[in-house]
């Protein structure tokens, strides 16, 4: 019963948005950040029997963070690489996302990271933020994108400066 009340509330909110912002497209987008760094984790690879493969590895802790938002229904998305995960970088990402879809209302679903709930967060007029429950990454489709990028793009790679 409780689950149905939540769904009715969301449906009512979307209907209200359609009335308030008539004529504008409403996009449901999912947002997340992923850290990519120079510290690699060797993965499995194929080789001949009795040969141990050599995979270069180093332990330099330099990271870049990919901020991304994707709309699962259309496949539209926006990604931005930033030096940190904090409120300042999140504000820049939100501003750029707003500029990318200026004529649309964006319902942006985020996880519960501190910079998503910060008092210093500046929301553009066309972005409405809401959060998924804690510890539920399976509810955020963009997590699959990060998983695929890590699997295909950075396996057994040493990134140079």
Predicted regions and their residues:
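Short functional hotspots at interaction and active-site rims
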Residues: 1-161
């Amino acid at each position: 019963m409780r689950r149905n009340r939540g769904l009715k509330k969301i449906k009512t909110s979307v209907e209200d948005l359609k009335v308030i912002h008539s004529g504008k497209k409403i996009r449901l987008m999912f947002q997340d950040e992923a850290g990519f760094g120079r510290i690699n984790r060797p993965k499995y690879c194929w080789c001949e029997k009795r040969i141990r493969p050599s995979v270069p590895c180093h332990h330099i802790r330099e990271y870049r963070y990919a901020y991304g938002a994707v709309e699962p229904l259309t496949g539209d998305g926006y990604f931005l690489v930033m030096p940190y995960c904090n409120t300042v970088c999140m504000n820049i990402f939100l501003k750029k996302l707003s500029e990318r879809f200026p004529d649309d209302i964006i319902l942006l679903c985020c996880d519960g990271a501190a910079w998503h709930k910060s008092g210093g967060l500046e929301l553009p007029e066309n972005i409405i933020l809401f959060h998924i429950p804690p510890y539920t990454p399976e509810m955020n489709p963009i997590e699959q994108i990060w998983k695929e990028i890590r699997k295909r793009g950075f396996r057994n790679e040493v990134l140079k400066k």
